[in-house]
Each structure stands twice: as C-alpha cells, then as structure tokens.
From Swiss-Prot:
Cofactor note: Binds 1 zinc ion per subunit.
Binding-site residues for Zn(2+), renumbered to this chain: 254, 435, 460, 464
Stated name of the protein: Cysteine--tRNA ligase
Family: Belongs to the class-I aminoacyl-tRNA synthetase family.
GO biological-process terms attached to the record: cysteinyl-tRNA aminoacylation
Residue positions binding ATP: 511
Length: 699
C-alpha cells in the first residue's frame, strides 16, 4: 500500500497505483516560477477558458495536490481542508473562498496538465519525466476534489450540497480535457476526523488522520466551544470567559460549615459547581477547583457543647457525612479542600496587612474590625451604597466598632472556646477572613471564578472583596466597568457566580417553617441521580422549587432516558472524534452560561431519535453527552431496578414474585397471575412482558 500525507490527512492507495505529490516536484517549482511573469501580466483579465486570472495569481502556476496513475486512468486529486476553520486565528472564512473555488480548481487542473507536458520534455529528474510520459499516455482522466468540511457547522458554512451545486454550475472541465477520451469529475465531501469508515465511495483509496495530527486540547476546546459566556454577578451581565491564565484556571467555592448534615441547599451548591467544573474541563481548561471547609464557627462551638463532644470529633463526623452525601450525588471531589483551622497563620498575616493599610483596626475588647468606609468600592457586588446598607440592613450594635457596618476579622477568646495566639491576644478568626486568606494562599492575589449560593452574595462575598483587595491592592481588569453608583469595579476575582435559592412548595426552606430537608432524608425516598437530575433541570441561577411532585417528575424523566439506553445499548462514542447536530446544540447550550435546561432538552430529543432508529452510535452519543454533566453513566437495568426501597420490596422479593407469576401463567392460573401483577403494581413495580420474558422496573 502506498501512502501520501497531505497536512493532517493520510491517503492510502492500493499497491498497483503509481502516486506522487505533484506540488513537491522539482520541475513543478521551476514551471511555477516561469509562469509567474505571465500571470502578473494577465492579472485581472479573463483567460480564453473563462478562468478568473485574478484568483491566487501571486503564486504563479498552481497544481493539484496528488496525481495517481492506474492502468490507463489519470487521477488528479485536489484537497481542500476546511476542517480547521474557526480553530486557527488566521484561518480564512469559507465564505471568502466559495465564489472563487470552481475557478481555482479549474486553473489547478489546467496548470497541472500543462506542467506534465513541460515535465515530459524538460524535467531534470528522470522519474518526473517518466511519470509525466505515463500520465499523458492515459486515455481517461478522473478528477476528485476532496473537501474536508468544517468541524464547527453553522449557517455561515455551506453544506456539502451547496458546494456541489456551486461546482456543478461553474466547474467546466471540457476546455481542459479535450485530448482525453473520457473525463470524470466528482467532489468528495467528508469530515474524516468524524467518520468511522475511512473508505470513500467511488474512489479506490482510503483517508485517515495520523496520530501525529491529533488536535491539541485547546483546538478540541474550540471545536465544541469557541466562546464560553458566563453571567458575572459583579457586572450583572454575561461576559465571554477569558481566564487570567488559560493554562491555569482557578475556581474557589465557599463550602460547608460542618456542624450538621448537609441540606438541599448544600446539595445544589455541590451539584452546580461540580457541573461547572466538569464543563470547564470538558472545554479543555486545566482547572484547579477549591472548595473550603469551615471547621471553626459559633455554630460549631455551640453544637459541640450541646452534644458533649469535642469540636474535632464533631467536625470530623460531619466532614465524613458531607463527603458521603456528595459522593452519592455523583459530585467529584474538589482538587483541594482547605480547612479553616489549618490556615490560621495566613489569616493573621492578612489581618496584619489590613491594619497596616489602614483598612482595619484593633478594638479595646481584643477584637479586630474591618473599617468598611475605608474601602470605596464596598457594596459593588450587592449593588448597594454604604448609605443604603446603613439604612436598610440590620447591623450588629457593638460599642467597640467605629461604624455599625464594620465587621469582625478577629474575635477575642472567650472562656471554654478554642483560641490561637495573635498580635491582638488569643482568639479566633471571623468567618469572612477565612475565605480571603485561603484563596490568596492557594491562588495568589487574583483568580478566575468565585462561586457560592446567592445567600452569600452579601455580606460574605462583599466582605471578601473588601478584605482581599484591601490587603493586596490587586484587582482583575473588568473592562472599565462601573457599578450603578458610578464607581469603578475593584475585585480580586474576575467572575463571581451564584446559584439560586431552593424553595419548598413555594416557600423559603428553613427550619423554623418545618420544611427543612437534609440530603439524607431526601435520598431515603429518591435515587441520588434523580436528585442530581432534578437540580440540573433548572438553570443554576434560577430559584428551584422542591416538592415531591417535582422529584417524581424528575424521576419519571430520568427513567425515560435510562429506558432508552436499556432498549438500545450504547456503543462506544468519542465526543472528540464525532460531531453531529446533537453534540453541537448540547455544547452551544452549555456554552451559554452553563445552560443545562437546554442541554437536557437536547438529551431528550436525542433519546427520541434513538427510540425511533435503535442506533447504538446515537445511544452512545446520548450516554457520552449525559456524562459531561454527570448523568446516565450507570447500568440502565441497575438504575431502573434500583432506587429507594420505599416501595417495601427488595429486588429478590420482586424476582420471586415474577417467577411465581410466570409459573401461574404456564399453569393457566390467570387469577393468580393477575393477583401478583396487582400486588406489584401496588408497590409501584412496572412489568413489561415481551418475547424474551418479563422485565421490570421501579415506578
């Protein structure tokens, strides 16, 4: 087999084909230069054969990429690789080339034939002379235009049928092939990187991409995701995601205060930012994801005293419980989970710097406070001025503060409470300083994304900005953006992301209203993946209303997707090597501020197509797309027969009842068969009788 490599494509020809890369011939280069003067003279004129001589004339003569000989047939092969359009900064738009393409190809054919005639008599290399002689002795010419279509499809790029019609209308070969008995011309349209069978129709060779031509992770990111947009709470608008350092994207999320079991609000934070982390990595960004653990706090101290256990015992127990809940929900562990108690020296150092910078002051009671009015940009995240905050917010009355809005950075020690040594006496850090110190310790003065629940926007995240910028003076560029009060934005974080609240039957979830649910309580009734799916069906910034009816609906919807995968087992599907309309729309949805609502809708459209076609490749696509956001990765039967045990029947009991029903049917005991079916229905066990037997799933 003879192989010819043209850029990223490898053409493999049968052994009896005589093949050459014509544009690498020595004589081709000489012939091209000799034609250069003629072409400059003819610039902007139309030749006798109707070819626009202005096209590409600066290069002199031009030839096709590959010439092949087989018996009495001459193959002229021109390759147009539009695959990388949109991937490379200087890539020309396909629109700019379309109108000239027929003339360009016709000219290449003319010049190739003329070059072969010249080489037959004038080539210095004997093999070029011999090849030309054999080529010109052929009595049939076959011309193939091999077009690699763009990876990024849109209305800006024509379909292959559009190109075919254009070539059919304008690609006239007769003037150049009068001396050949037969002439055959056909454009071949492919996207070799995304087809499973490299053998093309009507041609004897195959085409593939060599391993050395694999796209980089950055190019793969651009294929699916030319621009991610994120809603920035700070600027109150969607912005293109342009990380400070694309090779080192950094995201910090405020984690849990570990004094109790995690509730549904925590579940939403876990799942939402797990989804965001997964997506950024899918786009090719090297991401470091940090989610902190607050393991010292007033509530922790009070709960430990109430339980009669040490703070260390309490926090260790609930950290383990938090991890168990997160694992159940399919949440990947953050790269780093710093604990507040392990970063006390960093907090003390930042407080010292704030005092030195005139942004904080020690009080007579041993506390240290942040002087809010010393930070002119305070209120930018919440959209409130200092006067608004003073008038509208409840502030702690404290005779040691200079201003009621000032907040505590360091708390003086109290009897029986844990304490650390500091320049201001023994004590412990305030809540807000923890995140500023830990994020600076891990990420430096600035980083890309800071996330958390909407309830943290004020005062916690507002205070973080004041602390971090007040200590370092470093801010991220926000394109000269301003708050609605007119001051310039000053933040150490480029993008602030906040997920919406969870409401229960339309009311805010709270212990006082008796509508407070822990993750563990919910998982007793619903499969963890159902809860994850329920969270992802809503946009992360929207309020999410929790109710049994909504969870039941999510369960039914996820069951439909898994039923599709059960009926049509998924084939292996590599998203980096396969692009279709579903993948494009899924990526476009996620690309638009992590639009899981639209992305999930694409999954259901795709499932509908799988149900109609039983296409294993499309089923593989469904599973692969679901996997991007942490869904549909389980064995379908395991999901359908698993779930919570609230129906009161174990899998073994269900299988036993089905076996007894089967025997009753064999004995024609229809009453017993119906009784067992009714019993299973009462327990929400759905039976499906088919030629292969009876299958079941939990309803």
């Amino acid at each position: 087999m003879t192989t010819i490599t043209e850029k990223r494509l490898t053409f493999a020809f049968p052994e009896d084909y005589y093949v050459t890369k014509y544009d690498e011939w020595e004589h081709y280069k000489i012939f091209q230069n000799s034609c250069n003067l003629r072409n400059k003279i003819d610039t902007n004129e139309k030749g006798k054969n109707g070819i626009n001589q202005s096209v590409d004339d600066d290069n002199g003569s031009s030839g096709v990429d590959i010439i092949a000989l087989h018996e009495s047939t001459l193959w002229l092969i021109e390759i147009k690789d539009y695959y990388r359009l949109g991937l490379e900064p200087n890539a020309q738009s396909i629109d700019e080339k379309l109108s000239d393409l027929p003339y360009l190809i016709a000219r290449k054919i003319r010049d190739s034939l003329a070059g072969l005639v010249s080489a037959k008599f004038k080539a210095e290399k004997q093999e070029e002379k011999d090849f030309s002689r054999l080529a010109l002795d052929c009595n049939e010419i076959k011309i193939v235009l091999h077009i690699e279509m763009p990876s990024i499809r849109s209305k800006l790029y024509p379909s292959s049928s559009d190109l075919a019609n254009l070539l059919k209308d304008k690609f006239k070969l007769s003037e150049f092939t009068k001396n050949f008995a037969n002439c055959y011309a056909e454009p071949i349209f492919t996207n070799i990187s995304h087809i499973n069978n490299p053998q093309l129709r009507n041609v004897p060779w195959s085409v593939s991409t060599g391993t050395e031509q694999k796209l980089s992770s950055e190019q793969q990111r651009l294929i699916h995701n030319p621009m991610t947009t994120i809603y920035n709470t700070l600027t109150r608008q969607k912005e293109p995601f342009a990380p400070i350092d694309p090779k080192n994207v950094r995201m910090y999320v405020c984690g849990m205060t570990v004094y109790d079991y995690c509730h549904l609000g925590h579940a939403r934070v876990m799942v939402v930012f797990d989804m965001i982390a997964r997506w950024l990595r899918e786009c090719g960004y090297p991401l470091t994801y940090v989610r902190n653990i607050t393991d010292i706090d007033d509530k922790i101290i009070a709960r430990a005293a109430e339980n009669g256990e040490t703070i260390g015992e309490l926090t260790a127990r609930f950290i383990q419980a938090m991890h168990e809940d997160a694992d159940a929900l399919g949440v990947l562990r953050p790269d780093i989970e710093p604990k507040a108690t392990e970063n006390i020296p960093q907090m003390i150092a930042m407080i010292e710097t704030l005092i030195q910078n005139g942004k904080a002051y020690p009080a007579a009671n041993g506390d240290v406070y942040y002087a809010v009015r010393e930070f002119s940009a305070y209120g930018q995240l919440s959209g409130k001025s200092l006067d608004d905050l003073r008038a509208g917010e409840r502030v702690e009355v404290d005779g040691f503060k200079r201003d009621p809005l000032d907040f505590v950075l360091w708390k003086a020690a109290k009897a029986g409470e844990p304490a650390w040594e500091s320049p201001w006496g023994n004590g412990r850090p305030g809540w807000h300083i923890e995140c500023s110190a830990m994020s600076e310790n891990l990420f430096g003065n600035t980083f890309d994304i800071h996330g958390g629940g909407a309830d943290l926007q004020f005062p916690h995240h507002e205070n973080e900005i004041a602390q971090s910028v007040g200590a370092t003076g470093h801010t991220c560029g926000h394109h000269h953006a301003q708050t609605h009060h007119g001051q310039s934005i000053a933040s150490h974080v480029k993008y602030w992301l906040h997920n919406g609240f969870i409401r229960v039957d339309g009311e805010k979830m709270s212990k006082s209203l008796g509508n407070f649910f822990t993750i563990r309580e919910v998982l007793k009734q619903y499969d963890p993946e159902v809860v994850r799916f329920f969270i992802l069906r809503a946009h992360y910034r929207s309020p999410l209303n929790y109710s049994d009816a909504h969870l039941d609906d999510a369960k039914g919807a996820l069951t439909r997707l898994y039923t599709t995968l059960k009926n049509t087992p998924a084939a292996e599907f590599d998203l980096s090597e396969n692009v279709n309309d579903y993948t494009r729309r899924f990526y476009a949805a996620m690309n638009d501020d992590f639009g899981t609502v639209e992305a999930v809708a694409v999954l259901f459209e795709l499932a509908g197509e799988v149900n109609k076609t039983n296409d294993a490749q499309l089923a593989g696509c469904l599973k692969a797309l679901g996997g991007i956001i942490g869904l549909l990765q389980r064995d379908p039967t395991e999901f359908l027969q698993g779930g919570a045990a609230s129906d009161g029947l174990s899998n073994e009991e269900i299988e036993d009842l089905i076996a007894r029903r089967k025997q009753a049917r064999a004995d024609k005991n229809w009453a017993e068969s119906d009784r067992i079916r009714d019993l299973l229905n009462e327990h929400k066990i759905i039976l499906e009788d088919n030629a292969g037997g009876t299958t079941w799933r939990r309803g």
